[in-house]
Protein backbone atom coordinates (compact mmCIF):
# COMPACT_ATOMS: atom_id res chain seq x y z
CA UNK A 1 0.00 0.00 0.00
CA UNK A 2 1.11 3.56 -0.69
CA UNK A 3 0.70 5.81 2.35
CA UNK A 4 1.62 9.42 3.03
CA UNK A 5 3.16 11.01 6.10
CA UNK A 6 2.92 14.75 6.72
CA UNK A 7 5.20 15.88 9.54
CA UNK A 8 8.57 14.14 9.86
CA UNK A 9 9.59 15.14 13.37
CA UNK A 10 10.03 13.35 16.70
CA UNK A 11 6.94 11.21 16.08
CA UNK A 12 6.52 11.29 12.31
CA UNK A 13 10.09 10.26 11.47
CA UNK A 14 10.23 6.94 13.39
CA UNK A 15 6.54 6.24 12.73
CA UNK A 16 6.94 6.61 8.96
CA UNK A 17 10.07 4.45 9.09
CA UNK A 18 8.06 1.76 10.89
CA UNK A 19 5.46 1.67 8.12
CA UNK A 20 8.18 1.56 5.48
CA UNK A 21 9.98 -1.29 7.22
CA UNK A 22 6.64 -3.13 7.35
CA UNK A 23 6.55 -3.15 3.54
CA UNK A 24 4.50 -0.06 2.68
CA UNK A 25 5.59 2.56 0.18
CA UNK A 26 5.83 5.75 2.24
CA UNK A 27 5.72 9.25 0.78
CA UNK A 28 6.85 11.96 3.18
CA UNK A 29 6.30 15.71 3.44
CA UNK A 30 7.82 18.01 6.01
CA UNK A 31 7.92 21.80 6.36
CA UNK A 32 8.21 23.36 2.90
CA UNK A 33 7.52 20.12 0.99
CA UNK A 34 4.64 19.66 -1.43
CA UNK A 35 1.59 18.18 0.27
CA UNK A 36 0.01 17.52 -3.13
CA UNK A 37 2.95 15.32 -4.17
CA UNK A 38 2.83 13.52 -0.82
CA UNK A 39 -0.87 12.59 -0.91
CA UNK A 40 -1.07 11.57 -4.58
CA UNK A 41 -2.04 7.89 -5.01
CA UNK A 42 -2.16 7.35 -1.22
CA UNK A 43 -5.08 5.57 0.45
CA UNK A 44 -4.14 6.75 3.94
CA UNK A 45 -2.27 9.97 4.73
CA UNK A 46 -1.03 10.24 8.32
CA UNK A 47 -0.67 13.69 9.89
CA UNK A 48 1.96 13.88 12.63
CA UNK A 49 2.48 17.61 13.05
CA UNK A 50 2.81 19.28 16.49
CA UNK A 51 -0.06 20.55 18.62
CA UNK A 52 2.20 22.76 20.76
CA UNK A 53 1.37 24.21 24.13
CA UNK A 54 2.54 27.60 25.34
CA UNK A 55 6.30 27.19 26.09
CA UNK A 56 5.62 27.88 29.77
CA UNK A 57 3.15 24.98 29.94
CA UNK A 58 5.20 21.92 28.94
CA UNK A 59 5.93 20.79 32.49
CA UNK A 60 9.53 21.81 33.10
CA UNK A 61 8.55 25.19 34.53
CA UNK A 62 6.25 26.07 37.43
CA UNK A 63 2.83 26.69 35.89
CA UNK A 64 0.14 25.49 38.31
CA UNK A 65 -0.51 29.12 39.25
CA UNK A 66 -1.00 30.22 35.61
CA UNK A 67 -4.30 30.43 33.73
CA UNK A 68 -5.22 27.14 31.99
CA UNK A 69 -4.65 27.00 28.22
CA UNK A 70 -5.59 24.59 25.44
CA UNK A 71 -3.04 23.30 22.93
CA UNK A 72 -2.53 25.23 19.70
CA UNK A 73 -4.10 23.52 16.69
CA UNK A 74 -3.02 26.07 14.07
CA UNK A 75 -0.45 23.78 12.44
CA UNK A 76 -2.85 20.82 12.30
CA UNK A 77 -5.64 22.94 10.85
CA UNK A 78 -3.33 24.41 8.22
CA UNK A 79 -2.10 20.97 7.12
CA UNK A 80 -5.60 19.43 7.09
CA UNK A 81 -6.91 22.37 5.03
CA UNK A 82 -4.12 22.08 2.46
CA UNK A 83 -4.38 18.29 2.22
CA UNK A 84 -8.16 18.44 1.86
CA UNK A 85 -7.82 20.59 -1.27
CA UNK A 86 -5.86 17.90 -3.11
CA UNK A 87 -7.53 14.74 -1.75
CA UNK A 88 -10.81 12.96 -2.53
CA UNK A 89 -13.40 10.62 -1.04
CA UNK A 90 -11.33 7.57 -2.00
CA UNK A 91 -8.64 8.67 0.44
CA UNK A 92 -8.45 9.20 4.19
CA UNK A 93 -6.53 11.60 6.42
CA UNK A 94 -5.40 10.07 9.72
CA UNK A 95 -4.46 12.50 12.48
CA UNK A 96 -2.13 10.97 15.07
CA UNK A 97 -1.23 14.16 16.97
CA UNK A 98 -2.55 14.63 20.52
CA UNK A 99 -5.65 16.81 20.91
CA UNK A 100 -8.01 17.46 23.82
CA UNK A 101 -11.48 15.86 23.89
CA UNK A 102 -13.90 17.74 21.64
CA UNK A 103 -11.23 19.13 19.32
CA UNK A 104 -11.73 16.91 16.26
CA UNK A 105 -15.41 17.70 15.86
CA UNK A 106 -15.16 21.35 16.91
CA UNK A 107 -11.94 22.45 15.21
CA UNK A 108 -10.89 19.98 12.53
CA UNK A 109 -13.55 17.69 11.00
CA UNK A 110 -15.20 20.40 8.90
CA UNK A 111 -11.84 21.17 7.27
CA UNK A 112 -11.78 17.71 5.63
CA UNK A 113 -15.05 17.90 3.67
CA UNK A 114 -13.49 16.68 0.39
CA UNK A 115 -12.00 13.54 1.91
CA UNK A 116 -12.31 11.31 4.99
CA UNK A 117 -10.82 11.85 8.44
CA UNK A 118 -9.85 9.51 11.28
CA UNK A 119 -8.22 10.12 14.65
CA UNK A 120 -5.61 7.47 15.47
CA UNK A 121 -3.31 8.58 18.33
CA UNK A 122 -0.47 6.33 19.46
CA UNK A 123 0.64 5.24 22.92
CA UNK A 124 4.36 5.71 22.38
CA UNK A 125 7.35 7.10 24.25
CA UNK A 126 10.27 9.07 22.86
CA UNK A 127 13.22 6.76 22.25
CA UNK A 128 11.05 3.66 21.81
CA UNK A 129 8.56 4.76 19.14
CA UNK A 130 9.09 1.81 16.77
CA UNK A 131 9.03 -0.77 19.56
CA UNK A 132 5.88 0.80 21.00
CA UNK A 133 4.20 0.78 17.58
CA UNK A 134 5.10 -2.89 17.11
CA UNK A 135 3.74 -3.83 20.55
CA UNK A 136 0.94 -1.39 21.42
CA UNK A 137 -1.28 -1.97 24.42
CA UNK A 138 -4.16 -1.03 22.14
CA UNK A 139 -4.78 0.69 18.81
CA UNK A 140 -7.38 3.47 18.97
CA UNK A 141 -9.30 4.69 15.92
CA UNK A 142 -11.98 7.37 15.98
CA UNK A 143 -14.32 8.41 13.18
CA UNK A 144 -16.20 6.78 10.30
CA UNK A 145 -16.69 3.08 11.04
CA UNK A 146 -15.95 1.84 7.50
CA UNK A 147 -12.66 3.73 7.23
CA UNK A 148 -11.80 2.74 10.81
CA UNK A 149 -12.30 -0.91 9.85
CA UNK A 150 -10.10 -0.45 6.77
CA UNK A 151 -7.34 1.08 8.88
CA UNK A 152 -7.60 -1.79 11.37
CA UNK A 153 -7.16 -4.29 8.53
CA UNK A 154 -4.03 -2.44 7.42
CA UNK A 155 -2.55 -2.72 10.94
CA UNK A 156 -3.54 -6.39 11.18
CA UNK A 157 -1.53 -7.08 8.01
CA UNK A 158 1.57 -5.46 9.53
CA UNK A 159 4.04 -6.87 12.09
CA UNK A 160 2.01 -5.39 14.94
CA UNK A 161 1.45 -7.43 18.10
CA UNK A 162 -1.95 -6.12 19.18
CA UNK A 163 -5.10 -7.95 20.22
CA UNK A 164 -7.11 -4.90 21.22
CA UNK A 165 -8.57 -2.42 18.74
CA UNK A 166 -10.70 0.34 20.23
CA UNK A 167 -12.94 2.02 17.64
CA UNK A 168 -15.34 4.80 18.52
CA UNK A 169 -16.32 8.41 18.07
CA UNK A 170 -13.75 11.17 17.90
CA UNK A 171 -14.59 12.12 21.48
CA UNK A 172 -14.20 8.57 22.77
CA UNK A 173 -10.77 8.14 21.22
CA UNK A 174 -9.60 11.65 22.17
CA UNK A 175 -10.55 10.88 25.76
CA UNK A 176 -9.01 7.40 25.79
CA UNK A 177 -5.68 8.83 24.63
CA UNK A 178 -5.51 11.85 26.94
CA UNK A 179 -6.76 10.06 30.06
CA UNK A 180 -4.36 7.17 29.44
CA UNK A 181 -1.46 9.64 29.49
CA UNK A 182 -2.69 11.53 32.52
CA UNK A 183 -3.47 8.33 34.43
CA UNK A 184 0.26 7.58 34.27
CA UNK A 185 1.10 10.99 35.73
CA UNK A 186 -1.42 10.36 38.51
CA UNK A 187 0.28 7.03 39.38
CA UNK A 188 3.74 8.59 39.41
CA UNK A 189 2.54 11.54 41.49
CA UNK A 190 0.91 9.18 44.00
CA UNK A 191 4.14 7.13 44.28
CA UNK A 192 6.15 10.29 44.83
CA UNK A 193 3.69 11.34 47.53
CA UNK A 194 4.52 8.09 49.34
CA UNK A 195 8.18 9.03 48.89
CA UNK A 196 7.53 12.41 50.53
CA UNK A 197 5.75 10.68 53.42
CA UNK A 198 8.77 8.38 53.89
CA UNK A 199 11.09 11.37 54.03
CA UNK A 200 8.91 13.14 56.62
CA UNK A 201 8.07 10.16 58.85
CA UNK A 202 11.32 8.22 58.89
CA UNK A 203 11.50 4.49 59.72
CA UNK A 204 10.02 3.85 56.28
CA UNK A 205 11.38 2.71 52.93
CA UNK A 206 9.20 3.94 50.08
CA UNK A 207 10.04 0.87 47.98
CA UNK A 208 8.48 -1.49 50.54
CA UNK A 209 5.18 0.36 50.21
CA UNK A 210 5.16 0.94 46.44
CA UNK A 211 6.25 -2.64 45.73
CA UNK A 212 3.42 -3.95 47.90
CA UNK A 213 0.98 -1.79 45.94
CA UNK A 214 2.56 -2.69 42.58
CA UNK A 215 2.00 -6.38 43.28
CA UNK A 216 -1.64 -5.78 44.22
CA UNK A 217 -2.89 -6.61 40.74
CA UNK A 218 -6.30 -7.83 41.88
CA UNK A 219 -7.65 -4.28 42.26
CA UNK A 220 -4.88 -1.74 41.68
CA UNK A 221 -3.92 -2.94 38.17
CA UNK A 222 -0.46 -2.84 36.59
CA UNK A 223 2.83 -2.53 38.51
CA UNK A 224 4.19 -0.17 35.84
CA UNK A 225 5.01 3.39 36.97
CA UNK A 226 4.99 2.27 40.59
CA UNK A 227 8.60 3.27 41.31
CA UNK A 228 8.97 6.53 43.24
CA UNK A 229 11.67 8.86 41.97
CA UNK A 230 11.69 11.95 39.77
CA UNK A 231 8.42 13.39 38.52
CA UNK A 232 6.73 12.43 35.28
CA UNK A 233 8.30 14.04 32.21
CA UNK A 234 8.31 14.17 28.44
CA UNK A 235 6.48 15.95 25.66
CA UNK A 236 3.11 14.30 26.42
CA UNK A 237 2.17 13.50 30.01
CA UNK A 238 2.90 16.76 31.89
CA UNK A 239 1.46 19.03 29.22
CA UNK A 240 -1.62 16.81 28.84
CA UNK A 241 -2.40 17.24 32.54
CA UNK A 242 -1.72 20.96 32.28
CA UNK A 243 -4.03 21.28 29.27
CA UNK A 244 -6.82 19.32 30.95
CA UNK A 245 -6.99 22.12 33.50
CA UNK A 246 -8.27 24.24 30.60
CA UNK A 247 -10.83 21.61 29.61
CA UNK A 248 -12.11 21.30 33.19
CA UNK A 249 -12.67 25.06 33.24
CA UNK A 250 -14.11 25.15 29.71
CA UNK A 251 -16.66 22.45 30.55
CA UNK A 252 -17.37 23.97 33.99
CA UNK A 253 -16.82 20.67 35.78
CA UNK A 254 -16.74 22.45 39.12
CA UNK A 255 -13.39 20.97 40.15
CA UNK A 256 -9.84 20.80 38.84
CA UNK A 257 -8.34 17.36 39.53
CA UNK A 258 -5.52 17.91 37.04
CA UNK A 259 -4.61 21.26 38.52
CA UNK A 260 -4.19 19.43 41.82
CA UNK A 261 -2.00 16.77 40.18
CA UNK A 262 0.21 19.39 38.54
CA UNK A 263 0.44 21.33 41.81
CA UNK A 264 1.45 18.10 43.59
CA UNK A 265 4.08 17.37 40.89
CA UNK A 266 5.55 20.84 41.35
CA UNK A 267 5.47 20.60 45.15
CA UNK A 268 7.26 17.24 44.99
CA UNK A 269 9.99 18.87 42.91
CA UNK A 270 10.15 21.63 45.53
CA UNK A 271 10.49 19.05 48.31
CA UNK A 272 13.39 17.39 46.51
CA UNK A 273 15.06 20.76 45.96
CA UNK A 274 14.62 21.56 49.67
CA UNK A 275 16.39 18.31 50.58
CA UNK A 276 19.25 19.14 48.21
CA UNK A 277 19.55 22.63 49.70
CA UNK A 278 19.73 21.19 53.21
CA UNK A 279 22.61 18.90 52.16
CA UNK A 280 24.25 21.77 50.32
CA UNK A 281 24.13 23.98 53.41
CA UNK A 282 25.24 21.21 55.79
CA UNK A 283 28.29 20.25 53.71
CA UNK A 284 28.99 23.64 52.11
CA UNK A 285 28.74 22.22 48.60
CA UNK A 286 27.00 23.47 45.43
CA UNK A 287 24.12 21.53 43.86
CA UNK A 288 24.53 19.78 40.51
CA UNK A 289 21.76 17.86 38.74
CA UNK A 290 23.03 15.01 36.57
CA UNK A 291 20.64 14.63 33.65
CA UNK A 292 18.83 17.65 32.21
CA UNK A 293 16.68 15.85 29.64
CA UNK A 294 13.41 14.21 30.66
CA UNK A 295 14.73 10.69 30.06
CA UNK A 296 18.16 8.99 29.99
CA UNK A 297 20.09 8.91 26.71
CA UNK A 298 17.80 11.43 24.99
CA UNK A 299 18.44 15.10 24.31
CA UNK A 300 14.81 16.23 24.62
CA UNK A 301 14.06 18.51 27.57
CA UNK A 302 10.27 18.66 27.11
CA UNK A 303 8.57 18.51 30.50
CA UNK A 304 11.89 17.70 32.18
CA UNK A 305 11.44 16.96 35.91
CA UNK A 306 15.12 17.85 36.38
CA UNK A 307 14.55 21.37 35.07
CA UNK A 308 11.46 21.61 37.26
CA UNK A 309 13.56 20.79 40.36
CA UNK A 310 16.06 23.45 39.26
CA UNK A 311 13.28 26.08 39.46
CA UNK A 312 13.37 25.67 43.24
CA UNK A 313 17.11 25.76 43.91
CA UNK A 314 20.33 27.32 42.67
CA UNK A 315 22.15 24.63 40.71
CA UNK A 316 24.00 23.66 37.55
CA UNK A 317 23.69 20.63 35.27
CA UNK A 318 26.14 17.83 34.49
CA UNK A 319 29.22 19.59 35.92
CA UNK A 320 31.61 17.09 37.53
CA UNK A 321 34.63 19.39 37.75
CA UNK A 322 34.39 19.96 41.51
CA UNK A 323 32.83 18.38 44.63
CA UNK A 324 29.09 18.96 44.95
CA UNK A 325 25.76 17.55 46.05
CA UNK A 326 24.84 15.57 42.94
CA UNK A 327 21.23 14.63 42.16
CA UNK A 328 21.39 11.52 39.94
CA UNK A 329 18.16 12.31 38.15
CA UNK A 330 18.28 9.61 35.48
CA UNK A 331 17.74 5.88 35.92
CA UNK A 332 18.38 3.67 32.92
CA UNK A 333 17.39 0.73 35.09
CA UNK A 334 13.91 2.05 35.85
CA UNK A 335 13.32 3.62 32.43
CA UNK A 336 14.76 1.04 30.07
CA UNK A 337 15.74 -1.95 32.22
CA UNK A 338 19.41 -1.31 31.41
CA UNK A 339 22.49 -0.85 33.58
CA UNK A 340 22.75 2.62 35.09
CA UNK A 341 25.41 5.04 33.93
CA UNK A 342 28.40 5.14 36.23
CA UNK A 343 29.54 8.58 37.40
CA UNK A 344 33.13 9.34 38.44
CA UNK A 345 32.30 12.05 40.95
CA UNK A 346 34.98 14.22 42.59
CA UNK A 347 36.17 13.18 46.05
CA UNK A 348 34.20 14.82 48.83
CA UNK A 349 30.95 14.81 46.84
CA UNK A 350 27.54 13.60 48.00
CA UNK A 351 25.39 11.64 45.55
CA UNK A 352 21.61 11.61 45.96
CA UNK A 353 19.78 8.82 44.15
CA UNK A 354 15.99 9.39 44.05
CA UNK A 355 15.60 5.89 42.58
CA UNK A 356 17.48 4.16 45.45
CA UNK A 357 19.46 1.93 43.07
CA UNK A 358 23.08 2.93 43.79
CA UNK A 359 24.90 1.63 46.85
CA UNK A 360 27.29 4.60 46.95
CA UNK A 361 24.49 7.21 47.07
CA UNK A 362 21.99 8.56 49.58
CA UNK A 363 18.61 7.01 48.79
CA UNK A 364 15.89 9.66 48.68
CA UNK A 365 12.71 8.15 50.06
CA UNK A 366 14.25 5.92 52.73
Please describe what each predicted stretch is.
Residues 1-366:
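Structural/interface elements that position substrates and couple domains in central-metabolism enzymes
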